[in-house]
Amino acid sequence: MLLIKNNPFRILGISLFDSEKEIQKKITKITRFTEVGKEVSFDLDLVKLFEIDRNLENINNSKRKIEKPLTKVLHSLFWFYQSNHVDEIGFENLSNGDIDKTIQIWEKVVKDREVTTKNFSTLSNLKTLYYIKYNVNGFDKDSFTRYLELTGKFFSNEEFEKYSKKIINSDNTNITNFEITKTFIDQILLEIKPFIDKENGITYSEIINSLNFFSTELNDYVSFKTTSTPTNNIEVRINETSE
């Protein structure tokens, strides 16, 4: 859950698509406030869900996490952004700590509907919220499998490439969608390792069955990863690439 609690976009109070100039302006502001012992808050702090600690160490760590294009995109996958009225309504409920109500609102927009530019943000927000839900009180398999389904739709949609380029603030990047999804799935497999083949947990077969919306290449990678490494020697890629 630290990918949510200490998400650099949350700690720094920046939106996913802020320009470098806007990012530096906000970093300067919160650094100065913190140095003199003043608190600063932002709309998406979501303190009813998790406490937030904007000490200088967390601020500096967060700055490093978004310096590289790949890790900036990866950390964005564990945060939110607002792009339409339905997002706004959801965030009003989420700011009050009501996860289930927010899911209900966003599911109406995403479930069985075509994902377009207009509701892509809601899909992104909903999958992030399911990440929180499956983690918040131990492991919840139904929420986890729904999270994978939504994330697969998110990655496979043509809007994702536009999204990642906008995060990086550049059309010129050598980062491939497969590199992003592969690094992402490594992190998820590592996180759920304690629940594999456990009571009230999940099996690798159930995980693979939830990857229908991911690319064939990613499915092949997960199948290889989960069958050829029974000891689950999976790297922590998100944190490693931040260094």
Where are these regions (language model features)?
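N-terminal J-domain/J-like co-chaperone modules of DnaJ/Hsp40 proteins
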Residues: M1-K48, N58, T71-L74
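Conserved "turn/edge" positions that cap or connect secondary-structure elements
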Residues: F9-L12, L49-I52, K72-H85, I89-F91
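Amphipathic alpha-helical protein-interaction segments
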Residues: Q24-T31, N58, S62, Q82-E243
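Residue-level detector of alpha-helical recognition elements and their boundaries
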Residues: S41-F42, L77-F78, T117
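Long, intrinsically disordered, low-complexity Ser/Thr/Pro-rich regulatory/activation regions
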Residues: S62-K72
